[in-house]
UniProtKB/Swiss-Prot annotation:
InterPro entries found in the cross-reference section: Ribosomal_uL6-like, Ribosomal_uL6-like_a/b-dom_sf, Ribosomal_uL6_a/b-dom, Ribosomal_uL6_bac-type, Ribosomal_uL6_CS
Segment forming the signal sequence: none
Keyword Calcium listed: no
Protein name, per record: Large ribosomal subunit protein uL6
One function term, GO molecular function aspect: structural constituent of ribosome
Amino acid sequence: MSRIGRLPISVPAGVEVSVDGSAVSVKGPKGTLTHTVSAPITVVVEDGTVQVSRPNDERESRSLHGLTRSLIANMIQGVSEGYTKQLEIVGTGYRVQAKGADLEFALGYSHPVPFSAPDGITLSVEGNNKVTVSGIDKQQVGQVAAKIRSLRLPDPYKGKGVRYAGEQIRRKAGKAGK
């Protein structure tokens, strides 16, 4: 059995997990998430735990077993606690401003770069160089944070750009002078 897949998932108080055919929906204090489980995998909810099982040891079943268990565990954590990612903007003149629910970045281009959050994602600005992305869907939070980072990737020579909080940028030496 999959080492990850065979572990039961405990459901915290205030979170409700329901299985309807191949759809698993998780409802909690922060919202509701739904996931469609692939064919060979079965999900059973009993007395405060969720158990994911597979019918056979075929390669596809084994790979989907641990994946499904992790996705359901992430959904449960998302609706109970939520997920956040923090980004830092480093560089002279690089800054971010909140414009309503959207953000406007100054990243060294000749124009400001607007960025609007998709549904289910909250963007907040601390100071003028820190952005916090938060939401209940782990995948969506990570994807939005990656999109913001891709607006100006960190430069390997000076380290300027948008980076995750705590991210170490590999620096390169400049040209050797004569």
